[in-house]
Amino acid sequence: DTNVGDPITFEITVNPTGQVNSVGNQIVSNGFDTTLVEFSTANINGTTTFSWTNDLTSIGLAASGTGNIPAFTAINTGTNPVIATITVTPTFENGGVSCTGPATPFEITVNPTAQVNPTVDMVVTDGDSVDIPFSTINTGGTSTYTWTNTDPTTGLTNTGSVSYTHLRAHETLDN
């Protein structure tokens, strides 16, 4: 004789691992504000928290934190762009069980302050064409040079702009 008891029913909940939606990279210039980084997830029926690390604190962002990353004033006092890798780790919690998901990186690039090296004053003959050299010590990108001329009788374009790493603006000057 075998005695069989009444069956019982119980539920097993299988939580997903933590997941974070893709975060876009940011590119800002020295002294300008980044945009708020709001982390989100596709997971439901629980709570997802986010922790993050920053591998380059010199940009003005702490080495680590939790939750969203507020806007901050980016710092780059050098002459090259700097790139910080921010790595966010999601943790899904439900029913007292935490499930950590894979870490996901994104980048914040901080460009240096734009600068132009001084050009020398020039004396030219009426009607001569002249190259005006522009250069910068900044590297790793393209600089845009913009000028304003307050004396249009020289023949130099009143305003202008060109984008190059190192360039010469070519103008014919008249008096």
Enumerate the predicted regions with their spans.
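A short beta-strand segment in extracellular, disulfide-stabilized domains
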Residues: 33-41, 128-137
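Solvent-exposed loop segments of extracellular immunoglobulin-like
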Residues: 45-54, 139-151
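C-terminal edge beta-strand
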Residues: 7-14, 101-111
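Short, solvent-exposed loop/turn segments at the edges of extracellular beta-sandwich modules
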Residues: 1-3, 91-98
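Short, solvent-exposed loop/linker segments at the N-terminal edge
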Residues: 27-33, 122-128
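Proline-enriched interdomain boundary motifs that mark the N-terminal boundary
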Residues: 17-24, 113-120
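Exposed beta-strand face motif in extracellular beta-rich ectodomains
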Residues: 80-86
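Conserved small/polar residues in nucleotide/adenosyl-binding loops
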Residues: 165-172
